[in-house]
Amino acid sequence: HMILNSNYYHALLNSIIGQQISVSAANAVKIRFFKLDKNMTPKKLLKIDIRTLKKIGLSRQKIQYIKNISIFFIENKKFINKIDQYDESVIRSKLIDIKGVGNWTIDMFLIFSLGHSNIAPRGDLGFNKAISKLYNKKLPLNDKYLLKIYKLWTPYNSMATWYLWRSLDPIPISY
């Protein structure tokens, strides 16, 4: 079953760490990252030396992105404290302004932190691979086809996505 991460800061950091790398590589970096401080906060992260973050496996770009998230959390406490009360479009419009946070990261956040039930991360490679396999379609899948699948699975796209990922890798993903 899917486990929600109620620590929104950690969830967004985990999504950045997990961008464009395998689940096992992401998990290894996450373990090293949280060994630095299991109760990482935005203020603590901003004090960590770049060399330390590079040693645990973060690229210079990902380091900048997690710093951007840290600054956002410091500057937007009211929004963060009430984020679960906003609808998807408001959350997307606010988070997309953080450099390094794109639709994929927001999709992961909506699924794994806020528990939104109808998110289909169409830009996710695993999601697309699993649909390709399930429906015997060649990659890359076009947007029109993905939209058709999205409508078919509404309002349960998040659950369908989770099971699609499980069809490729039995290790549950969490962010």
Question: What spans do the regions from the language model cover?
Answer:
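Alpha-helical scaffold segments that form or flank carboxylate-/histidine-based iron centers
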Residues: 4-18
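N-terminal alpha-helical segment
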Residues: 9-13, 45-49, 87-91, 127, ...
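A broad detector of the eukaryotic-type serine/threonine protein kinase catalytic domain
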Residues: 17, 50, 74, 78, ...
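Alpha-helical ds-nucleic-acid-binding substructure associated with the helix-hairpin-helix region
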Residues: 21-22, 26-97, 152-154
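C-terminal accessory module of base-excision DNA glycosylases/AP lyases that mediates lesion recognition
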Residues: 84, 88-90, 103-175
